[in-house]
Amino acid sequence: MADFVLIHGTTQGPNGWNRLIRELAKNGHRSTAVDLAAAPAKTSGELVRVVKSQVPDDFHAPVVVAHSGTGPLIPSICRELRASHAVWLAALVPDRDATLQQEIESAPTSIFSHEWIGENPTTDVPAAIYFLFHDCDLETLRWALSTVRLFAPAFLYASNPPALAELPSTYIAGIHDRVIQPSWSRRAAHSRLGANYITLDSGHCPHVSRPVEVAMILNKLPA
């Protein structure tokens, strides 16, 4: 059985992983959802140490799963934790030749849906429903709205992360994502990661709306 370290995105807290954690446990896996806001951090390196401090000591060669805007942290976290696999869940994939900040400034709508530009779902409930949880049933939606929280330090996109070397990667995308353009994530997964690219009939938060399906994918990752 595998150990999973779950990294929340920029618009949810760690409790957003609760449904997926339950599904992983049914398959005998252990998982921990870290809180990136648990301690102050001024750099990506400090943030990686915040993550490491919350991972149990007996988690060896874990699978690191990061969602959405915290994708740029994956390489550094994987290196620090000596991860066995990286999973990019509807996540931003950094480029070695330019920072994500530079890429976003030069061509924002090549990465993001044009509707998403300028929106903040952490202060606007209709925006949270429309962009993050539009594929949820009512019960799930009510719960999901309670997990919304802003975490968006400016330094997150301002530097180039280290290369992932030979670490296996899997990219999971929602074909109805209203935040990140699926066409961009497909290109980035292939050209920047050489990753296996898997699509789900979901929006931007498949761990919320499709936890069983996400758990099935994670359960089948190579050991």
Label the model's feature ranges.
Residues 64-65, 86, 171:
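Conserved alpha/beta-hydrolase fold motif
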Residues 65-74:
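Gly/Ala-rich beta-loop-alpha elbow adjacent to hydrolase catalytic centers
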Residues 2-40:
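Conserved HGGG/HGGXW glycine-rich cap/lid loop of the alpha/beta-hydrolase fold
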Residues 30-63, 78, 101-109:
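Active-site loop/oxyanion-hole signature of alpha/beta-hydrolase fold enzymes
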Residues 35-39, 92, 203:
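Short beta-to-alpha linker loops that shape the active-site pocket of alpha/beta-hydrolase fold enzymes
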